[in-house]
Structure formats: structure tokens, C-alpha cells
Amino acid sequence: MIIFGIDPGLSGAISVLENKKVIEVFDMPTMIDGKKNKRQVNGAHVTNIIKERIDNEKEIAVVVEHVNAMPGQGVTSMFNFGQSFGVIKGICSALSLPIYFVRPTKWKKHFNLIKTNKEASRTKVIEVYPEISSKLHRKKDSNKADAILIARYFNDTQV
């Protein structure tokens, strides 16, 4: 089974796991849109990442973190996040891929990461997958770690 783990949002990430092994991990592809140079998810690039890794012989699952609005988050920020989330859902629908949603508390509890900082998920992934530590060397790579753990959670609990 090939599992795509997705931490949605402009600073999110996409991971690809097969047989509990991390095949690849990407920062969320973005592009600049409009006169105000606002970033948004590059749907075409996300589509290519997924399509190029689909093997018709294997079962596919796309697992997306299901996040709600956070207190103190502005209206524009919530709209942008929702737009990114919608792009990912649309891509999966267009490609006829099964999409599953997991709340952050579910996958974080599975890995004992409740009430920890963002750095903890990166540390956890490096412990489990030391061979990819070079891909997670920056602090901002915690989003890549989240995407990996989202896919791994699905693998551990659903497969």
C-alpha cells in the first residue's frame, strides 16, 4: 500500500510511505498569486507529486490532517487554510483516490506527542527513520515530520 500523508496549508508537507518506509517527503508546493504576491498551494504540482507515485497495482490512501480554526487566527488566515484544504480534497476527488482525515489529537496521541512542541515530531521521526534525518535537519522541517507521522499513523491503525 502507498500512503500519502498530508499536512495541509502553505507551510505543510506531503509524505509518501510504502510498507512503513518513507519513500519521499516534500514541502507543500506553493506559488505566488495576484498583485499582492500572496502564496497559495500549487495544485498542479501537488497533482503531479501524487500522480507520478501512483502504482495501479497497489492500494492507495491519502491521509490528510483535519484541522479546525484556532483561536486568535484571523479571518484571512482561516480562509487561506480552508482554500489549501479544498485544493487537496479536489485533487483527490479528481484522481478518484480515497481520502481519509485524521485529527491532530489522534495521531499525536498515538505517538505520545500530546502537549509537546513542534520539534518533538521531528525528533520522533528521526528516531524511527534515522536514514532520512538529513531531510529533516531544519527546524521548519517539523511539517515534513508531521506529514510522515500522519501517514504512519494510518499505516499503524488502519492497514
Give short role names for the model-derived ranges.
Residues M1-V159:
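Phosphate- and other anionic-substrate recognition elements at nucleic-acid/protein interfaces
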